[in-house]
């Protein structure tokens, strides 16, 4: 596996490749990331991964400086997955001058849910993903359903900007107790880690309520929020949305069997966790 930081060297290395499968990450790789590499291999060859902790998608009071950086461990894991190239640019490589041009998603998708609580987050994501796509020029790219809203925004962005990249969705990988794998799980104390699976259990309860015939979605959401708060969480949202566009479903959508998803974000101690479950 070649480890490359220069954009020009990356382009030289990939010249002539027209079936590249790309997996962008921020590093601190876990089994969820590695499952993305394996899925990428099913859809293209060679597989290219990137590791870049993107300052543009962190808010002023978020964990950019604390975000775990484990490049050497990550390299060893990617070598075992037979990744062809790891693109690991420095901040100077990606942003040699102030990034004045930004890619901003539409407000109806980028300013809800995560976008409401993390202003500018999806503009940072879209900007860096567009730039990475321009560098790698993949045929397919793999994104996890764990970041459901991000997946939808990136997919729509590629469609609307006519980027010739097929976005492949990967299922969320979970620990045996149900907790979705995340690089931020390492922030959890032992007691918090024992409590953390309750987030996925709460989503499962929401799904059961909807599938069981309850139609007052606001009441279901409020019940879930209260349940988490009573256990010491600080939830930002528990929200049932249409999978197609993340708009809140009407009664007609529910009766018609519209595919839904419930999404949540909540703080446990100092650690903010997100998760979702399709209904």
Swiss-Prot record:
Keyword tags: ATP-binding, Cytoplasm, Ligase, Nucleotide-binding, Pantothenate biosynthesis
List the molecular function annotations (GO) for this entry: ATP binding; pantoate-beta-alanine ligase activity
**Protein residues bound to ATP:** 26-33, 144-147, 173, 181-184
What Pfam families does the entry give?
Answer: Pantoate_ligase
Q: What is its main location?
A: cytoplasm
UniProt miscellaneous comment:
The reaction proceeds by a bi uni uni bi ping pong mechanism.
Listed under subunit, the entry gives:
Homodimer.
Q: Which named protein is this?
A: Pantothenate synthetase
């Amino acid at each position: 596996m070649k480890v490359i930081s220069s954009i020009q060297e990356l382009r030289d290395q990939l010249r002539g490749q027209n079936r590249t499968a790309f997996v962008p990450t921020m590093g601190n790789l876990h089994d969820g990331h590695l499952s993305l590499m394996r899925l990428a291999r099913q859809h293209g060859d060679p597989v290219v991964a990137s590791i870049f902790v993107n300052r543009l998608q962190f808010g002023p009071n978020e964990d950019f400086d604390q975000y775990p950086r484990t490049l050497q461990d990550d390299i060893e894991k990617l070598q075992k997955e037979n990744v062809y190239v790891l693109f690991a640019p420095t901040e100077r490589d990606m942003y040699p001058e102030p990034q004045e041009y930004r890619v901003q998603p539409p407000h109806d998708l980028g300013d809800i849910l995560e976008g409401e609580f993390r202003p500018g987050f999806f503009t940072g994501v879209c900007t860096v993903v567009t730039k990475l796509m321009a560098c790698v020029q993949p045929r397919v790219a793999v994104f996890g359903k764990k970041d459901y809203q991000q997946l939808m925004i990136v997919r729509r962005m590629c469609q609307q900007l006519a980027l010739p990249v097929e976005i492949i969705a990967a299922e969320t990988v979970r620990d045996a107790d149900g907790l979705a794998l995340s690089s931020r799980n390492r922030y959890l104390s032992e007691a918090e880690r024992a409590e953390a699976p309750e987030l996925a259990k709460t989503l499962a309860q929401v799904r059961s309520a909807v599938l069981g015939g309850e139609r007052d979605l606001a009441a279901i959401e409020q019940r879930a929020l209260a349940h988490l708060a009573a256990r010491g969480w600080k939830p930002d949202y528990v929200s049932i949305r249409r999978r197609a566009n993340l708009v809140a479903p009407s009664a007609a959508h529910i009766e018609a069997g519209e595919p839904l998803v419930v999404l949540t974000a909540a703080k446990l101690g100092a650690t903010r966790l997100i998760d979702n479950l399709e209904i």
